[in-house]
Amino acid sequence: MHLVENFALTAGVKISKPHIEPLFYPPPADKYITLHAGSGMESKNYSHYKDVISIIKPILDERGISILQIGETHDPHVDGTISLLGKTKLRETFFILSKSMLHLSNDSFSSHVAGFYNVPLVTLFGPTFPNTCHPFWRGEHKFLSPDYSKFKPSYSPNEEEKRIDKIFPNEIAYELIKMLFGDGIINQTESVHLGESYSQVVTDIVPNFTPEKNIN
């Protein structure tokens, strides 16, 4: 049961579609998708958006589509996006979302607002079940989550090893491009493992000489 249905059942009221009043804000691009990398819970925040953007940006650039990042001032800026972090009021953010071609985000308020406007959604889940917390009003969508067969969602605001980070960046990129343009634009690849050192840069230095035996 979805949380909205649960609340309605508990309160004994009917579910009706809310009214959201946006406020005009001039978008810095004519055609764009939106990214919201933050949320109210650290465990919901996906750590590998940079890799997703590196895959999809060349494809979007060819078609004149920008990536606008919305969120708070303290949210980390994702390379390859136009930052609107801390630059829009809440209702102005609603306007930006309402005109977006697609919205990519964690399980956060922005996905629910974008879904209200029937904006196509690619939404990531980690510490919560998608079927209970997904945007209640939505159009075309793809909800991605880790494998819950062994370990169920924690519903904790902090996780020592974030479950959401088990979602492969190439899977997100594939679903996003497929939703925008259909099949055939990007190849679907099968990933095997995404470890805790995935985001670390490791440099191996291999000398091109044999050191002397008495070297200290």
Regions found by a protein language model. Name each.
Residues 1-216:
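Catalytic machinery of carbohydrate-active enzymes
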